[in-house]
């Protein structure tokens, strides 16, 4: 079977069969995209932003913009890797994942300190959307491309790869949009009570901070990233 980006001779299959097979691959990509968007490091990071939104529409937009940032990164770097027929060394892949851990700790810290000032400034919609888009970009850089390219071993041309990435990306947008809409409900309603909202915001921050520390330890120590850099 040809890998993505390689030009080989077509197998003796009828065109309708090949079209059906490709559509099946795209549908699988859509499902995998939805599933991928709901990975723990994704939903924890986005929750820290959504927890401070007072309108459900902003929570929904946050999920969409995370997916856009994630998809744009996958598309650009995924196609580049395909065209250059290259791959990142494990050290760099793990380093990008380690950055996600740092980001989670940072986002968690911001939430934990959010109510330390008496005059709390609600983040503007533009600020929130920029932040959540950057989070999506970082997640897109951190190993997702490798997983997508592995799945794309069933397609044979660059344009099919590009289409697959876009469909996969649409799946991540749909998945995160649904999640942020649902998770945004308790945060929006709790915004009427400072005490309740403070607890929820700090809870989201605590989870993000703790998971970020665990994530960095897992990659740096357990998976051996630090040893790779020392060599």
Name every feature range the model reports, one short phrase each.
Residues 11-13, 110-141, 195, 223-231:
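Alpha-helical multi-pass membrane helix bundles of inner-membrane/thylakoid proteins
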Residues 39-42, 70, 105, 139, ...:
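Divalent metal-coordination and catalytic microenvironments
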Residues 38-44, 141-150:
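Transmembrane helix boundary and interhelical junction motifs in multipass membrane proteins
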Residues 18-37, 59-64, 125-138, 160-169:
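Small-residue-enriched transmembrane helix starts and helix-helix packing motifs
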């Amino acid at each position: 079977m040809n890998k993505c980006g390689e030009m080989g001779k077509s197998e003796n299959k009828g065109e309708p069969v090949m079209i059906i097979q490709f559509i099946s691959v795209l549908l699988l990509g859509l499902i995998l995209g939805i599933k991928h968007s709901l990975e723990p490091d994704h939903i924890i990071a986005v929750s820290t932003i959504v927890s401070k939104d007072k309108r459900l529409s902003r929570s929904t937009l946050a999920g969409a913009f995370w997916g856009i940032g994630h998809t744009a990164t996958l598309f650009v770097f995924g196609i580049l890797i395909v065209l250059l027929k290259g791959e990142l060394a494990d050290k760099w892949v793990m380093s990008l994942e380690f950055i996600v851990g740092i980001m989670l700790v940072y986002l968690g810290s911001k939430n934990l300190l959010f109510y330390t000032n008496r005059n709390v400034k609600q983040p503007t919609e533009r600020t929130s959307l920029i932040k959540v888009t950057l989070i999506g970009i970082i997640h897109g850089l951190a190993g997702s491309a490798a997983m997508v390219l592995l799945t794309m071993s069933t397609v044979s041309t660059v344009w099919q790869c590009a289409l697959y990435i876009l469909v996969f990306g649409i799946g991540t947008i749909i998945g995160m949009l649904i999640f942020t809409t649902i998770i945004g409900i308790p945060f929006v309603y709790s915004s009427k009570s400072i005490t309740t909202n403070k607890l929820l915001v700090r809870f989201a921050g605590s989870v993000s901070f703790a998971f970020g520390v665990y994530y960095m330890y897992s990659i740096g120590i357990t998976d051996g990233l630090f040893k790779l850099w020392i060599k």
